[in-house]
Design a protein with these regions (language model features):
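Active-site-adjacent pocket scaffolds in enzyme catalytic domains
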Residues: 114-206
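Structural motif corresponding to the early beta-alpha repeats
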Residues: 74, 78-92, 110
Length: 206
């Protein structure tokens, strides 16, 4: 039996890495918050539950989002406080962000996804940081190499990840990894989930 798990990266238009250099010093009024009720209505209509990987500053802006998500049977998870690439953070700063998000969510968050899927050999410390804060799973691994992120020779099904084994099951790993979905398009293997791919690929494919 195949099991599909839906994760939604809840971030605004100014959060993606490619946009940030152009809007870094500008004030932002989050617009995505206005769409949360519509998203939840669509999920209810399709009898679907989802995990919302939340950028923490959006929850700071409107704390009521938390109850809206949880009361409708969905899950909250961490996507950093400001959508910072992991390469821009230290372990200490990341731990502080985890504490902040824990306070915002009353300890409800047990999962994490790295912005821009920036988990790599240089940022593998994040696995230990998540374990220190009693997190249960990660969903940052893209099991195909792209220009910006991803891995080669990676397991496609969920596996136990560790800071020394980011792509294959580590029997001693304590954190569960849910890799992103990939598929073939015109004979080329590529990710088929995530905002860019959902916009770019035909509806039947994505």
């Amino acid at each position: 039996m195949n099991l599909n798990i839906l994760g939604i990266d809840f971030e605004d238009w100014y959060h993606p890495q490619l946009v940030q250099p152009f809007v870094k010093n500008l004030e932002h009024d989050p617009k995505i918050i206005n769409g949360i009720k519509k998203i939840i209505e669509l999920l209810q209509k399709n009898k679907t539950s989802a995990t919302f990987f939340m950028v923490g500053e959006l929850l700071e802006h409107d704390p009521s989002i938390l109850d809206l998500i949880l009361d409708n049977g969905h899950e909250i998870a961490f996507h950093t406080m400001t959508h910072s690439n992991l390469n821009e953070l230290t372990k200490e700063k990341f731990l502080n962000e985890l504490d902040t998000f824990d306070n915002l969510t009353d300890g409800k968050s047990k999962g994490f996804r790295a912005p821009t899927f920036s988990l790599n050999r240089n940022t593998s410390w994040v696995i230990d940081a998540l374990l220190e804060k009693k997190y249960l799973y990660d969903s940052s691994v893209v099991p195909v190499k792209t220009q910006l992120y991803g891995f080669t020779n990676c397991q496609l099904e969920p596996f136990r990840i560790s800071n020394s084994s980011l792509t294959r099951n580590d029997p001693n790993g304590e954190l569960l990894e849910f890799p992103l979905m990939i598929g073939k398009f015109f004979g080329k293997t590529m990710p088929v989930s995530g905002g860019f791919y959902l916009r770019f690929l035909p509806l039947k494919t994505s």
